[in-house]
Amino acid sequence: MATISDIAKLAGVSQGTVSNVLNKKCNVSSDKIKKVMDAALELGYIPNERAKLLRKGHSNLLSVILPNIQSKQYIEFYLGFKSYTDSHDYDVLIQLTNENNPDTEILAVQQARSYMARGIAVFTSFNNDNIYNPYIDETGSLKSNEEILFIDRKVSYSDHFIGFDYEEAGRKLALKAIECKYSNICLLTGPLSFSNENDFYHGFMSVISQSYCCVQHVQTDAHRKLQNIMQFFDNQIPQAVFLSNYDFAECVKDIYNTFYYSDNLPIYTVSPLFTMPENDFIKYELNHRKLGYLAAKYLIDALDNSIPIKSTLLENSGFRHWHAHIDTNATLKPLRILTLDTPSAYSMKHLSKLYTQKTGTPVEITTVLYDEMYSALSSLGPDSKYDILRIDVTWLNWFSEQILQPLDKIDPSVLSDLNSFIPSTIEPYSTIKGHLYTLPFTPSIASLFYRKDLFENSIYKQMYWEKYKKNLEVPTTFDEFNKIARFFTKKFNPISPVDYGATLTLGSYGVSSSEFLIRLFSQQENLYDKNNEIRLNSSVANWALNNLIETKKYSSPDYCKWWTDTASAFAEGNVAMAILYTNFASNILNPYSKVIGNVGFASTPGHNPIIGGGYLGVSKYSKRPKESLSFIRWACNEPISSARTALGSVSACKLTYDNYEIINHYPWLNLAQKDFINCHGHRTPPSCTTPFNEYKFVGLLGKSVKDVYNGIKQSQDALNEVQELFQKEFHTL
């Protein structure tokens, strides 16, 4: 096995230098770092993590003790737990137990301690009846070897607990049985010695006992479930089965469909959260991935920040209604939707089939390009065939009163939907002159995406320091952005691993203007200045345009024409940074992507990101406004919004950002949710009530950007010209 001494000899450096490089200390030249890393790779060096732990005296290791890794709820918990530890430099030791054999849990705890785990998250099978308990000492107090957090199953000897309200889950499922007027049901639970199972059972029975329903209770566990279920079905077939555990529900379904199938057997079960619709069961859902995420957070907060762990009950997700807001009295005539050609349009095409299945109403979706969309909206008239319109967020001010019906006049109850959305996606976009015209469908923001592996590489970090005497960090200004882009452009740095430092997206005039405005708003909050005047030829505007033109040197001459191109270019792995709207970012993770696992993301420099994306409204000329609004409410709310996001779209619903299956896959969405509140960039002061024609504005501005980019005009001349045109075209502001 290769040693530090072997590496030092091969690299021609001291052992101290090797140690500094391997421990990522920043006091070694880039040349020596490269020699050490090359030598370590050639020798197949593997760090001795055990020795490192002994030197430190502690590890950054947490143990997760699970009953099994077959059940979906435990898989979801672990994935949520791991996502948090990965982002906080902790490792996870996963251990499995046999709930019928306490010795397996004792062994798991002993192993965790032998590995010097600093914390343990455990679904314990121990209670007060056990003669020996690995978590408490002879006085009955919790041992202080490490932080221990009990998951889902409460214990009398510790309040270090996080879980769900299983008693409430039991009550809600019992209400379903009463609502369906069942007279004979099976209630299947795990061992009632576990607090969650006991709480569920008592919650269920406290409600069902008020009815005339006969309940046959079957108590089982993971090892006897098949036998117990088959024995019950041999004696009788109930009208429905109610279960405390999704794993049990799958067994009931498989056994019934294989051996006893006659009529459909309704199965109601407590279940992990499902992002996509699933029809096998009626599910009362619990967000186990969030449970895992918060469990890891609580442990790490206790260990690193001395924040005491308190007993926590998370809110149950409950019955999630995939057909909420749907008008089941809808006609069979198609609903017609006009939308921009984006990833969201394709996810809507797929999910609208659920709407059609429920109502019988076909949904026809027409997709058009950016410029075609404006023309189509501008030419709408009484003969228009469209019922629902997807309008770009920056066009709402101009189009809302011209072509949309106020939603609150169609159905005032729509105002209650606003509570489910991220607040900063509503005002000032959906509401015009006191009326609600649209609901947020795919609100997005421009974010900075970067190659995390390049920014964290010790060789490039040292090289950057040697060149600029500054640390290589995610840029917070566009001057820093260009400096880093230059560093990662092969033309200016031959050993750069990528050809270009950045992308530019400059297709149409509207797209080109976005690159300029992102830079302008890094320096000023809104389009108007402190005097409420719009000066497109100001010194700040000139700086923004020149900064953009400098980026030209660090980007491909074959610039991106649309945001899907930008996502694809970044995914190809030949660029260090890209600015991209989050509703297009899912394509970064396409099947051919070369950057999966190495995608970093941050707010755009200046921390005043531009908002983008689309909102849905009812056409002024629709003959079916109530049906159209019903569809919009269904499409924009939970759980459809989360399903759309999983398919590559984005959501305005707050609950989507608690779905860690989505957030783990598209982690930049969490940043986007928090960044909406930082979006300003308003075109006119609040006192101005004149509609602002965004399309015309970005057309003027984008032409100037393209003229300067192509060398036709100098920046100040182009800006003076666009200012003159702006004053002429927008003189009524």
Task: Report the location of each language-model feature.
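Extracytoplasmic/periplasmic solute-binding protein
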Residues: 435-441, 446, 476-533, 575
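Extracytoplasmic/periplasmic substrate-recognition and gating elements
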Residues: 305, 553, 591-658, 683-687, ...
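C-terminal capping/gating helix-and-loop segments adjacent to ligand/active sites or protein-protein/ligand interfaces
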Residues: 367, 671-726, 730
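N-terminal helix-turn-helix DNA-binding module of bacterial transcription factors
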Residues: 1-58
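N-terminal helix-turn-helix/winged-helix DNA-binding helices
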Residues: 1-2, 41-79, 88, 114, ...
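Glycine-centered hinge/linker elements that transmit conformational signals in sensory
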Residues: 482-487, 519, 523-561, 589
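Hinge/lid segment of periplasmic solute-binding proteins
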Residues: 393-447, 598-602
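Alpha-helical recognition/docking segments in bacterial nutrient-uptake
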Residues: 64, 68-175, 229-240, 247-250, ...
